Structures are given as C-alpha cells and as structure tokens.
Amino acid sequence: GLQVCEECFSDKRKVREHKCMKNSALASFLAYKEAMKWTRMRLEAVTDAFICPSRFMADKMVQGNFDKQKINTLCNFIDIAKTRKDDYDKENYYCYIGRLSPEKGIGTLIEAAKRLPYPLKIIGGGSLEETLRAAAAGSDIELLGYKHWPEIKEIVGKARFCVVPSEWYENNPLSVIESQCLGTPVLGSRIGGIPELIDEGKTGMLFESGNAKELKARIGQMFATPFEYRQIALGAQKRYSAERYYAKLLKIYTSL
C-alpha cells in the first residue's frame, strides 16, 4: 500500500503478512527471519553506540525500545566543494529532484503544479514517468529525466526553490541538504526527518504531506518570499561540511 505502516513495532510477522519487502513473499520471509535473528537485545549487546542521521530515526529507535543512552544523532554531510558557486542568481521556476514513484509524493506535486502559473522542472526517472508525462501535457511542467551532477547543480542552483513532497518517511534526505548548499530553499512535506532540516521562513517552508491544496498555497508563498539565497548556501555549507561531521563523530567515539 501507499500508507506508512508501523505494525512491525508490535508484531514482526506483519512484514510477511503485508509482503513489505518488494511486495515479494520470499523477500519478506527473509526479512522476517533476519529481524528475528538480529533482535534488539542482540544488537544492543554488540553495539556501543547507535548513530542516527536524524532525530526522527533516533525517536523511532526509542519507540522500538532501544537503549536511549546508546543513541546519538549525527546529520549526514556532503562534499561541499561540489556545491560552491560564483553567484546565487535565480530564474523564475521551481524544481523537483528524485525518483518518480508514488511514495515520493510526485503525484501530489503534479496535481498542485497544474493549477499554478509557475514553471516546474522535474529531474529524475522512475515507474511513474510516463504517467506523469501524460498528466503534465499542456502545462508548464517539464520532465527532464535523469541528469548528472553538473546539470543538476545548474538547474537546482538557479531554481527559486526545490520541492521535497515525500509521503513516506525520509530519514535525512540529501536532496534537501544539497539544495540548501546551492543556495536554494526547500519546500518540504512535514514527515520523517525533513522538518529538522528546514528553518521555516528562512531556509524554506513545510506543508502537510499528501495535501495538494496546502502544497499549492505554499508554492505561491515560496515565490512571494524574498529568501537570502547566499546566506542559505553559506549556512548550509558550514552545517553540512565533512569537517564538522568528523569532529562530532570523533566526539561520539571518544566518549565511549
């Protein structure tokens, strides 16, 4: 299904019942057997510290009864050098980058975007590509397909903002981090670890996951907001640098 399910917290057999792994009975059976072998107690017995890329994941581990004292939160980092730019000039469009599949919320984005006068550039491929092309026909929505980093940097870097409309949990999505490091604010769904990465009104905005009506309104607000693009980039490049990550990682290790 397309709804977020947490039934395995109370009964791991649900992974078999719902065929949660690739919608395959065999893959789901193997996942169940692995989960039964590597129980929480067995994992805790051989682990000094669990490192989670988001507070969201840390909270889910606590929900699963992992020892809170062993759980640490450390956000992902990226290669900052690849995001550096000479200018932060913007063009009058917004963008999406990611897989074109139902859980990414791309259908909700298309539904909202078709009712708006703003150009939307979509980067990526996936199972919904042909369906989305048909849905976007006659609108100001451009599906660009798969792109390599130099093209992604150019498109995302010049966008007024990037939309991350996920409808399933995201842990610590690099699409948000990379966009901000390019000086591009993010309009993200209020789900998983996405809200932790967005300072509303300063580095982006949030909307209710799956709510096309609210997304439509927020897109208009994003275009109307005078974001400080250079400051977004400089702040993100400092926050998500490898040096900062390694310093925090070393602090965790030396505390053991």
Locate each region found by the language model.
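Donor nucleotide-sugar binding/catalytic pocket of nucleotide-sugar-dependent glycosyltransferases
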Residues: 6-83, 143
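Conserved donor-binding/catalytic core segment of Leloir-type glycosyltransferases
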Residues: 51, 86-117
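Nucleotide-activated donor-binding/catalytic signature segment of Leloir-type glycosyltransferases, i.e.
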Residues: 130-154
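A short alpha->beta transition loop at the rim of the catalytic pocket in nucleotide-sugar-dependent
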Residues: 160, 183
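Nucleotide-sugar-dependent
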Residues: 165-174, 195-196
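Short acidic/histidine- and often glycine-rich active-site loop of Leloir-type glycosyltransferases
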Residues: 176-177, 191-201, 205-206
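Short hydrophobic beta-strand element within catalytic cores of glycosyltransferases
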Residues: 185-188
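A short, well-ordered alpha-helix in the C-terminal region of glycosyltransferases
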Residues: 203, 214, 221, 227-242, ...
